UniProtKB/Swiss-Prot annotation:
Belongs to the metallophosphoesterase superfamily. Purple acid phosphatase family. Induction: Methylation at positions A1306, A1341 and A1666 of the APHA mRNA is regulated by the MTA1 methyltransferase and controls its stability and subsequent translation. Disruption phenotype: Leads to the up-regulation of genes involved in biosynthesis of amino acids, ABC transporters, and metabolic pathways; and down-regulation of genes involved in DNA replication, cell cycle, meiosis, and mismatch repair. Its main location: secreted. One of its GO terms (molecular function) is metal ion binding. One of its GO terms (cellular component) is extracellular region. Keywords: Glycoprotein, Hydrolase, Secreted, Signal. Residues 1-22 form the signal peptide. It catalyses: a phosphate monoester + H2O = an alcohol + phosphate. It is found in: Secreted. The keyword Secreted applies. This is Acid phosphatase A.
Length: 504
């Protein structure tokens, strides 16, 4: 990893003050033009539509319907928010009472917008097969965010000068090319890498604008995906602060708008759900679901259901004992807290306890920092393991999805570092994957030292994962090479799911 001092040493004397500002996207002449569009599951039969504009909207509105030529329904809100250093306002409108598993067309109300479409969420309990794509640690491409492998080998550089509208490269391009193969996207942490602005020397003279420019460019690049697919987000360390190294001198210079997950919270806070009302016939499940809803704090920790899976999103950065990004944490990022002491773990237990396997047989937990990884101690979050792993085992979580380490990894079902003897055939321990190789300015992390529970590790090119919920008992996991679409690894987890509620 480069440091700011390394960058400054490489510059001519007294040149810093004369460096050009970062490359912002052009502001449209119509300031109501929607940009950076994003969709999310907001609740049962509900989808939130989020977008940014270059002026505050008094009443953001969305027109929609099941025909592209008949957008006869309209919903509006009063949600148009910003923060100190942002050039844009984040707008949110929630579309409710949608027919499940149906193609809807929508248009953000503006004098300069187009019609887009999305597939509405499946009802909890729908046992139809579906696939979700998992993309983590995804950065901006172009002048502010070229990608280069972390090992520094110049023969393995990947320089991407610009992003064409066709999205014909790497992970975003593969998501576009395989549009019909998946129904929604899971992205637990690290968006854009604006806090790495100092790695591009031309940014060093104007870090405040460089940070915002990277965010604007990244979310513009992501919009063709996130504006047409439900895109579920939770935080990573690169959302925490204006720079990622935890250097006190830079910490003090971070403006208020670029501290404490501000952009992430403003951008996604009104889009993500709290948790779903339980559709279980069990009274205790309903009580736990209601408790979880009261304790949820989106976009940091929350849950949702889609067809036959219950997904619990966690914050591995703050709000649990010894959290790495918390004040005085090991990462030095001074983030949070976002709830009362113990709130996230209270939510986590109530939410897991609420899951009725006759409705949603599959239980998935997604967060950013892993506690199983190759490459040594620096790649794992021991505090996360202490906080979350016992509850994941107790309530029978089937799969843990994480990133942070910039490669792709798959692990045998494991608990407390002991591999489940059943392997992939009805284990009691959770299976874990890392899908952190999507591509960003920091490049790929070498596989490094292996561990006994690892079954696959890949760090040669950018990649991501897909999860296919085949039926109530079989979950297929594939890792895909972004550039080619080749399958790098494929496995299937079998779970009998004979118990309505798991507590082991």
């Amino acid at each position: 990893m480069y440091t700011l001092l390394d960058i400054l040493k490489g510059l001519p004397l007294l040149a810093v003050a004369a460096i050009a500002s970062a490359d912002y996207p052009t502001i449209p002449s119509d300031l109501t033009t929607p940009v950076q569009q994003r969709l999310a599951i907001s609740g049962m039969n509900s989808v939130s539509v989020g977008w940014n504009t270059y002026e505050k909207l008094l009443k953001p509105c969305v027109q929609y319907g099941t025909s592209s030529t008949d957008l006869s329904q309209e919903t509006c809100s009063l949600i148009s928010t910003t923060y100190n250093t942002s050039r844009t306002w984040s707008n949110t409108v929630i579309l409710t009472d949608l027919t499940p598993a149906t193609t809807y067309y929508y248009q953000i109300v503006s004098t300069n917008s187009t019609v887009n479409s999305f597939f509405s969420p499946r009802t909890p309990g729908d046992k139809s097969p579906f696939t979700t794509s998992v993309v983590i640690d995804l950065g901006v491409y172009g002048a502010d965010g070229f990608t280069v492998d972390a090992d520094g080998d110049p023969t393995r550089k990947v320089l991407i000068p610009e992003v064409e509208p066709a999205l014909n490269h790497t992970t975003i391009g593969r998501l576009a090319d395989t549009w019909d193969d998946y129904e929604w996207v899971l992205h637990p942490g690290d968006f854009g890498y604006a806090d790495d602005w100092y790695l591009t020397p031309t940014n060093v003279g104007d870090g405040v604008n460089a940070y915002e420019a990277i965010l604007e460019n990244f979310y513009d690049q992501l919009a063709p995906i996130a504006g047409g697919k439900v895109y579920m987000a939770s935080p990573g360390n690169h959302e925490a602060d204006c720079e990622e190294l935890g250097t006190p001198a830079i910490e003090l210079s971070c403006p208020e708008g670029q501290k404490n997950f501000t952009d992430f919270n403003v951008r996604f806070g009104k889009n993500m759900p709290t948790s779903f009302s339980s559709t279980s016939s069990n009274t205790k499940a309903k009580v736990n679901a209601n408790k979880a809803a009261a304790l949820a704090n989106p976009p940091f920790w929350y849950s949702f259901e889609y067809g036959m899976v219950h997904v619990t999103m966690i914050d591995t950065e703050t709000d649990f004992p010894n959290a790495p990004d918390a004040p005085f944490g090991t990462a030095g990022l001074d983030g949070g807290p976002f709830g009362y002491t113990g709130q996230q773990l209270d939510f986590f237990e109530a939410d897991l306890a609420s899951v009725d396997r006759t409705v949603t047989p599959w239980l998935l937990v997604a967060g950013h920092r892993p506690w199983y990884s190759t490459g040594g101690q620096s790649n794992i979050c021991s505090a996360c393991k202490t906080a979350f792993e016992p509850l994941m085992y107790q309530y029978g979580v089937d799969l843990g999805v994480f990133g942070h380490v910039h490669n792709s990894q798959r692990f045998a079902p494991v608990n407390n570092s002991v591999v489940d003897p059943a392997g992939m055939d009805n284990p009691t321990a959770p299976m874990y994957i890392i899908a952190g190789g999507a591509g960003n300015i920091e490049g790929l992390s070498s596989v490094g030292n292996n561990i006994s529970s690892n079954r696959f590790a890949y760090a040669e090119t950018f990649s991501y994962a897909t999860l296919t919920f085949e039926d109530e008992n079989n979950l297929s996991i594939q890792f895909i090479e972004s550039a080619t679409g080749d399958i790098l690894d494929s496995s299937t987890l079998y779970k009998a799911h004979t118990e309505q509620f798991v507590n082991q």
